[in-house]
């Protein structure tokens, strides 16, 4: 299904393709964006289609992948869903929610998606590209591919790799991860499967995550260049990046080097976990060790627990119930435990979840109603309408301070008047954004709909100090660097490493 029309931007777009998923495409685009921004250019990130439950909400309430939002920050611009016009949010059982230009278009199976959604998807991608170039006529687009560009069973319906490269006549770089092994076969195999006109677009090869002495790979570099007639433009050393991973499989590979933490945080690894970027500010705290909880266990080793967001809340609550974790969490709460739920995690902390329209899944695989963990007297009902919006509010607990973040959820949560609601109190001035309850035994149970809550430095410090006080630890003092400043520093360091080890100038012509 060849589409040969082409767009002709003023500045040559760059495209980052990979030999596989996890090769380093996202970080490469992030680094290039910051390098070009610092050089005075106007870079704009773009990924035609992304599959991720790690999402962001733009200024217009549109959903987009968090990785493209992060790339926009690196480029020094405000994220917009046009930078990621198609977002697929996996729901399990080979189904995904389809997001076009930030808005949900429904749920489909993988088979039906490839059959029915190709032309609408390509139209959305072209519309987004035209819109970006109308708004930023002198920009340089930095495009990210997805997975491998040569999945031969899907290539005729691949919306986001070589089709985009040919449409824009982009200068492409092929990135491969040497740490996983098989780098020579990955490079040669990928190039051999391309058509001649596609292979001509590949202007360079980038070796990512090299450990050890770079000089030891000099012969390998020469072999690749002699075999492919394409220059190896860079060898990036292994970097201890602190960015949140793009999917939940990579999530478990993140290792902490912290050996003597002051606080130990347990995060429940839900089967349908979403928005795990919520915990990036905690990962960047020097005194906190994060552990992922995946099975029933004694939770008293943790100073506080987090129940994260979920793409399928009822299904994940069923997992907590059937695995025994729901009972473990209740037992933890009676031992001065501190528990915090975000979005779906807040819903699960309540007494009941009802899904009259089966918004949480199919009628076969999903329960219409299920009891929650029961630690907060809250009832959640899932309706047809999905709420996506940015939040600017003010907290009243644990301290009065300004709050920013965003909401992405189905479901409306309200007090369950069949329960004792006397002890539950609102966290924010906008009363429906979150609640908390202090345990008689000590500790607090709290939850919010606000994603990005821990990015709010003052709020995070006061919440952590509440826990530190209960552990007789010294309270945190007012910090000199915000989380967002740390994130900017991480992006700068990433860009500096790429600039030292990657000849980007040859791609700009």
Swiss-Prot record:
What are the UniProt keywords, alphabetically?
Cobalamin biosynthesis, Glutamine amidotransferase
User: Could you tell me which Gene3D superfamilies the record lists for this protein?
Assistant: 3.40.50.880, P-loop containing nucleotide triphosphate hydrolases (3.40.50.300)
For whether the record's keyword set contains Lipid metabolism, the answer is no
GO terms of biological process kind:
cobalamin biosynthetic process
Pathway-wise, it operates in: Cofactor biosynthesis; adenosylcobalamin biosynthesis
**Pfam families attached here?**
CbiA, GATase_3
Q: SUPFAM superfamilies from the xrefs?
A: Class I glutamine amidotransferase-like (SSF52317), P-loop containing nucleoside triphosphate hydrolases (SSF52540)
Q: From the record, what ranges are coiled-coil?
A: none
Classification via InterPro entries: Class_I_gatase-like (IPR029062), CobQ/CobB/MinD/ParA_Nub-bd_dom (IPR002586), CobQ_GATase1 (IPR033949), CobQ_synth (IPR004459), GATase_3 (IPR011698), P-loop_NTPase (IPR027417)
What would you give as a GO molecular function for this chain, any one? catalytic activity
Q: Where is the GATase cobBQ-type domain?
A: 262-459
Q: Where is the active site?
A: 343, 451
Q: Which PANTHER family match?
A: COBYRIC ACID SYNTHASE, DETHIOBIOTIN SYNTHETASE
Q: What does this protein do?
A: Catalyzes amidations at positions B, D, E, and G on adenosylcobyrinic A,C-diamide. NH(2) groups are provided by glutamine, and one molecule of ATP is hydrogenolyzed for each amidation.
What family name appears in the similarity comment?
Answer: Belongs to the CobB/CobQ family. CobQ subfamily.
**Protein name as catalogued:** Cobyric acid synthase
Species the sequence originates in: Prochlorococcus marinus subsp. pastoris (strain CCMP1986 / NIES-2087 / MED4)
